[in-house]
Regions:
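DNA replication initiation on ssDNA origins
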Residues: 1-96, 101-109
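Alpha-helix boundary/N-cap detector
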Residues: 4-7, 117, 121
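Active-site-adjacent structural elements in folded domains
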Residues: 82-84, 133-136
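Short, flexible/disordered intra-domain loops and linkers
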Residues: 107-118
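Short amphipathic alpha-helix segments
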Residues: 118-135
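Short, conserved phosphate-binding/catalytic loop or strand-edge motifs used
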Residues: 139-146
Length: 146
């Protein structure tokens, strides 16, 4: 079964990208290998990432990269073990701030219903705080394990 949900890839692009804004895709294999690709359109991203989705975990940048990142070797393709990847110093503008809330529990365990409810309550408080303090509407997501 293929793990790439193409509709979700388009949803990501339409929600978090601005036109032909660059995005780095970082891939991490179970054996520790890394790969990187830099894309400015979703069709190339999907085509290049698709072969990796069954055996690699896929991550992406949410904030803006400089236009000259198009000059890196992994522009519009995936390179395994690249010499250079994007880093925090390359971010030119922060469009998003990611807030990750997790319950305190043993590593490798799922949250109890009580922990999920508590974390949801905290997430609602954070959401309201951001809204009350002038932040743009939030993108809210919930993982499957609490």
């Amino acid at each position: 079964m293929e793990r790439l949900d193409i509709a979700e890839a388009y949803k990501f692009w339409d929600t978090l990208r601005d036109g032909n804004q660059l995005t780095e895709i970082r891939l991490i294999a179970n054996d520790g290998r890394t790969a990187s690709g830099i894309f400015d359109n979703v069709e190339d991203l999907i085509r290049c990432v698709k072969p990796y989705t069954n055996d690699w975990n896929v991550y992406y940048t949410i904030n803006r990269l400089p236009d000259d990142a198009r000059g890196l070797p992994q522009y519009n393709k995936i390179i395994v073990r690249p010499k250079q990847t994007c880093n925090d110093n390359m971010i030119t503008l922060r469009d998003y701030v990611c807030v990750d809330l997790d319950s305190i529990r043993l590593s490798g365990t799922n949250a109890t219903d009580e922990q999920v409810n508590y974390t949801q309550k905290k997430a609602n408080e954070v959401y309201q705080f951001l809204k009350d303090n002038g932040f743009n509407p939030c993108v809210v997501a919930k993982s499957g394990n609490g």
